[in-house]
């Protein structure tokens, strides 16, 4: 008899068939309490859980006594109570490698769009304001040869450093929990403390997960330390930056511009002051959002769950200690 799983994300037919070859699959639209109650028997017997974006917490786990593995279609897992899973000896699988290059492309796009004011001037053209040869009021700033500061030198940070170093001849600074010798060897990246990075970088790019330590790591003090010509890019998690402090820094001219893929509350409120600032490029958490990468993430998550329920957790496991 096949193990049973709960699927709370729509998958392409080929990936669904791959799951069904190994498991009895119950598809649900979400993990809301009313959904769990409606499918109580399926949740109670499920050994696997696969999906994205929904909260996985102790209350849900109480309804899933047979659960052995959860697989998230994401690299981040701040919506999952990992400690609760580990305490129950439930492994959590994620998809870190398949989105690296695509997210780095997004960060680079935000750097270019903010520096060259692409969104702002494109909207002005559409509004009929381009009536003569443009002057300084339409100009942006260069990206090439400027100093890039990366906060969080993981896979995505490395991919960004590669683009900046080889493609744009940018000196690279980085701050992370530990030094990254490969980044220093390949890209001549210089490790420094956060204050030094903030004071020297022309672009401050944040690629951090959300933890107790990183929440509001960037606040009024940090923005005040940045150059008035600096551009702030956040492509990690929204709450890593205090959004009110960022808004104030932009309004007061403490920094030049911001490119934001993530926000403290998502979707971003239509009343947010950020949406009225011509020096802000705000996009709806599109970091990995290409057809190719999202398919690859789903395929990876499917394979992760198949492997995990066969006891294979050598790669992509967040909490391997849970299997011990």
Swiss-Prot record:
It catalyses: glycolate + NADP(+) = glyoxylate + NADPH + H(+); (R)-glycerate + NAD(+) = 3-hydroxypyruvate + NADH + H(+); (R)-glycerate + NADP(+) = 3-hydroxypyruvate + NADPH + H(+). It is found in: Cytoplasm. The keyword NADP applies. Keywords: Cytoplasm, NAD, NADP, Oxidoreductase. It is an enzyme of class 1 (oxidoreductase). Its EC number is 1.1.1.79, 1.1.1.81. The active site is at residues 237, 266, 285. One of its GO terms (cellular component) is plasma membrane. InterPro entries: D-isomer_2-hydroxyacid_DH (IPR050223), D-isomer_2_OHA_DH_cat_dom (IPR006139), D-isomer_DH_CS (IPR029753), D-isomer_DH_NAD-bd (IPR006140), Glyo/OHPyrv_Rdtase_B (IPR023756), NAD(P)-bd_dom_sf (IPR036291). GO terms for molecular function: glyoxylate reductase (NADPH) activity; hydroxypyruvate reductase (NADH) activity; hydroxypyruvate reductase (NADPH) activity; NAD binding. Belongs to the D-isomer specific 2-hydroxyacid dehydrogenase family. GhrB subfamily. Homodimer. HAMAP family: 2_Hacid_dh_C_GhrB. Catalyzes the NADPH-dependent reduction of glyoxylate and hydroxypyruvate into glycolate and glycerate, respectively. This is Glyoxylate/hydroxypyruvate reductase B. It comes from Salmonella gallinarum (strain 287/91 / NCTC 13346). The gene is ghrB.
């Amino acid at each position: 008899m096949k193990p049973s799983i709960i699927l709370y994300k729509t998958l392409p037919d080929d990936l669904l068939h791959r799951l069904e070859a190994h498991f009895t699959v119950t598809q649900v639209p979400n993990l809301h309490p009313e959904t769990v109650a409606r499918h109580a028997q399926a949740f109670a017997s499920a050994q696997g859980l696969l999906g994205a974006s929904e909260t996985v917490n102790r209350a849900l786990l109480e309804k899933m006594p047979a659960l052995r593995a959860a697989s998230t279609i994401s690299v981040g897992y701040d919506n999952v109570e990992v400690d609760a899973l580990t305490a129950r000896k439930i492994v959590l699988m994620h998809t870190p490698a398949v989105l690296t290059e695509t997210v780095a492309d997004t960060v680079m796009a935000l750097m270019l769009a903010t520096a060259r004011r692409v969104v702002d001037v494109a909207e002005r053209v559409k509004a009929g304001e381009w009536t003569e040869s443009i002057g300084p009021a339409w100009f942006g700033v260069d990206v090439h040869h400027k100093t890039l500061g990366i906060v969080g030198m993981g896979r995505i940070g490395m991919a960004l450093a590669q683009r900046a170093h080889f493609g744009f001849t940018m000196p690279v600074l980085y701050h992370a929990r530990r030094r990254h010798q490969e980044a220093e060897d390949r890209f001549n990246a210089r490790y420094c403390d956060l204050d030094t990075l903030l004071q020297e970088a022309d672009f401050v790019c944040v690629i951090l997960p959300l933890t107790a330590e990183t929440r509001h790591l960037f606040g009024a003090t940090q923005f005040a330390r940045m150059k008035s010509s600096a551009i702030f890019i956040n492509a990690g998690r929204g709450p890593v930056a205090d959004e009110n402090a960022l808004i104030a820094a932009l309004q007061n001219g403490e920094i030049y511009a911001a490119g934001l893929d993530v926000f403290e509350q998502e979707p971003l409120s239509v009343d947010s002051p950020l949406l009225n600032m011509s020096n802000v490029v705000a996009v709806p958490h599109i970091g990995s959002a290409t057809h190719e990468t999202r398919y690859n993430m789903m395929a990876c998550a499917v394979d992760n769950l198949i492997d995990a329920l066969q006891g294979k957790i050598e790669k992509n496991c967040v909490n391997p200690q849970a299997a011990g």
